Regions:
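C-terminal outer-membrane beta-barrel translocator/porin domains of Gram-negative envelope proteins
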Residues: 1-125, 129-133, 142, 151-154, ...
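Generic structural signal for short, solvent-exposed loop/turn connectors between secondary structure elements
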Residues: 124-126, 173-175, 187
């Protein structure tokens, strides 16, 4: 199920979007160690159920102010891969901003998690607006790494991560221009400043 009334693909200020996805996966994993490794070749069969729910909505508070919110929850019954790195690359991700969709951050990945945030927006004109986005992310069971680079589940609800972004957006008929600054709780001192021009087009993934 997927529905949307948003007025923009990248920086909406009106409408809502909602998606409920249920998927069943069956596959085969092959692992080939590098030269000099004492680990042998490995082949595993995997099957799991994955459920996810996402919703974002925007509310007009006044002539200039809009308050949006975002929620995503995911549950996957998948087993661990051969090592920690492979496990994290296959784990579900919380990426509510355009910048986070383009980066790989292990701190915001888990097989089961809940993430939510608010999006206060101040409309300067029909073309320009100031936008704040502030999110919290909590894995139900965080994925940890032992001394052998194997994955295991940590204590339930023992980790919390956050990210925030402030941007100035110009919306044009052919795309958007955005100047932004953002911060992630992990890695430490993770600050980014950038300029985005045009549209970022993401196709549907085989594993959502």
């Amino acid at each position: 199920f997927n529905g949307s009334t948003l007025n923009s693909k990248q920086y909406p200020t009106r409408g809502y979007r909602e998606a409920l996805v249920a998927q069943i996966f069956v596959g085969k994993e092959r692992f080939y160690p590098g030269e000099g490794s004492t680990t042998s070749n490995n082949k595993d069969h995997h099957s799991w159920l994955q459920l996810s729910y996402m919703k974002e909505k925007y509310h007009n508070m006044s002539e200039h102010w809009v308050l949006g919110w975002y929620l995503k929850a995911l549950y996957a019954s998948k087993n661990f891969s051969e090592n920690y790195t492979a496990t994290m690359m296959q784990a579900g991700e919380f990426s509510p901003t355009l910048h986070s969709k383009l980066t790989y951050n292990e701190a915001f990945r888990a097989n089961q998690f809940v993430g939510a945030g608010i999006r206060p927006i101040y409309r300067l004109s029909q073309m320009f607006h100031l936008r704040g986005e502030f999110y919290g992310f909590m894995p139900i069971y965080p994925i940890e790494k032992n001394s052998l680079n194997k994955a295991y589940y940590g204590k339930a609800f023992s980790k919390f991560e956050y990210l925030g972004e402030i941007s100035v957006v110009c919306q044009l008929p052919f795309g958007d221009i955005s100047a932004y600054i953002n911060h992630y709780s992990s890695p430490k001192r993770e600050w980014n400043v950038g300029l985005s021009i045009g549209l970022q087009l993401f196709n549907y993934r085989f594993i959502e």
